[in-house]
Amino acid sequence: MNGIEVLCQYQNGRKSFIRNSLSRIEIIQSDLSAVDFSRAELEWVNFSGTNLSRANLHRADLMHAKLIGTKLISANLKSADLSFADLSWVNCENAALVRADLIDTNLSGANLLKADLTDANLSGANLTGVNLSGANLSRANLSGANLTGVDLSGANLSRVDFSNANFEEANLVEVDFFRAEMSECNLQQATLIHTTLKGANFSNANLRGASLKGVVLKNLKNTLSMKSEFNIPELSQSDRLDLSGANLSGANLSGANFQNCSFRFAFMQKANLYKANLKDSSLIEVHLKNSNMQSANLNNSILSGINLQGTTMPDGSVHQ
């Protein structure tokens, strides 16, 4: 069947196209709401601008599909294969994308408000400017994904793999990063206010200019920590956040709770640590030049080889 035949049959009352082979058909700016394409072969189709709200695309093969500006509101895309597809400016509000394959998919400008992406694979996907507010990405794979300027406020990102992902200027307010893999991430100028980072791994992440005011970091479990080169028992604990080698230069960390955190070899020049809780933390070979540590809690912290030139100390004095 070609696109015209499918559309005519739909308009005449047919809603089920289960397991149909419909590769390369073109149906643009039409109404296919509530259609059933479950398990259908839809590789290379062009549904740009079409209304597929409430459609059933469970386990459909949509590799290389063109869905630019398509409406997929409340659609069922569970276990669908959308790898290499173009979903730019798509509306997937409240859509179910559980276990969906979105490898190298273009989702720039997409609306994924409250979408369920649990266990989805978005490695290498382009998520620039996407609205993921309130979305569930629990256990999803976003390694190497581009999330520049993305809105993830209030999203559940627990146990998500974000290694090497780009979060530059992203809105991460009140996001749950519980046990997330954030190593090598770019979080420059990102906003992480009131964000939960319990058990997350930020090894070698770049948080230059990021705002982490009010982040929740205490009582961490099962964090992936870098192996210590120092024979210090405290560093072998499994319940600490690892920010080893992270770039926090210029970051606003005022009032943040970093208790029992490892900052080994971190770059924190000009960082604002006013009233930050650094109790029991490891600050070995940290660059803190010109930072503000006024009223910070350093009780029982390990401090060794630190560059404190021009730093405002907890008592208000400036280190020379």
How would you label these PLM feature ranges?
Residues N2-Q320:
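Tandem repeat scaffolds
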